[in-house]
Amino acid sequence: MSEVRLPPLRALDDFVLGSARLVAPDPCDPQRWCHRVINNLLYYQTNYLICFGLGLALAGYVRPLHTLLSALVVAVALGMLVCAAENRAAVRRCRRSHPAACLAAVLAVGFLVLWAAGGAGTFLLSIAGPVLLILVHASLRLRNLKNKIENKIESIGLKRTPMGLLLEALGQEQEAGS
């Protein structure tokens, strides 16, 4: 296995401006929609990481303690999901067949814990808000030829990225190559 590397930052023109083609996905074809989201998450992962970081920085500036608590709670919930999926076949099957529900469950657990601790608003601003914006962009952005080539290289194992590892942990590695 090759070393894990972050792909280059995609141009703003490619990401959201001029050449970016944004089209609503077909809700009647969830498989194709899922492939679009996964492939866009892989291709634009550096841009998404920056967007997520900006959301965390903004919330961290406003409420630093609640932002750290939010990040910790979500990391623990995600770690528990991955650990449970590695040890229990039923959880692994659920994670693979219902990835959106698993992500929603992780975010819901994080929200409930932080609501009890008084940091629900910060959680929504720092974690859930950027994740929602990233998923909306990944759903709307049509793939281009360069995107498809990069995703093929990732899927055959010639290149490893942090998003690829995260998708594997969430049980989506078989989807990424499609």
UniProtKB/Swiss-Prot annotation:
Asked if Endoplasmic reticulum is a keyword of the record, the answer is no
A GO biological process this protein is involved in? protein transport
Q: Where are the transmembrane segments?
A: 42-62, 65-85, 97-119, 123-140
Annotated membrane topology: Multi-pass membrane protein
Does the entry feature the keyword Membrane, yes or no?
Answer: yes
**Which stretches are Cytoplasmic in the membrane topology?**
1-41, 86-96, 141-178
Provide this UniProt record's keywords sorted from A to Z.
Answer: Endosome, Membrane, Protein transport, Transmembrane, Transmembrane helix, Transport
Membrane-side (Extracellular) residue stretches:
63-64, 120-122
Any single GO CC term annotated in Swiss-Prot or TrEMBL for this entry? endosome membrane
| InterPro entries in UniProt | Prenylated_rab_accept_PRA1 (IPR004895)
Which Pfam families does the UniProt entry name for this protein? Answer: PRA1
Cell location: Endosome membrane
In which family does this protein belong, per the annotation? Belongs to the PRA1 family.
What role does this protein play?
Answer: May be involved in ER/Golgi transport and vesicular traffic. Plays a proapoptotic role in cerulenin-induced neuroblastoma apoptosis.
Self-association and partners: Interacts with CCR5 and GDE1.
Q: What is this protein called?
A: PRA1 family protein 2
Q: What is the species listed in this Swiss-Prot or TrEMBL entry? A: Bos taurus (Bovine)
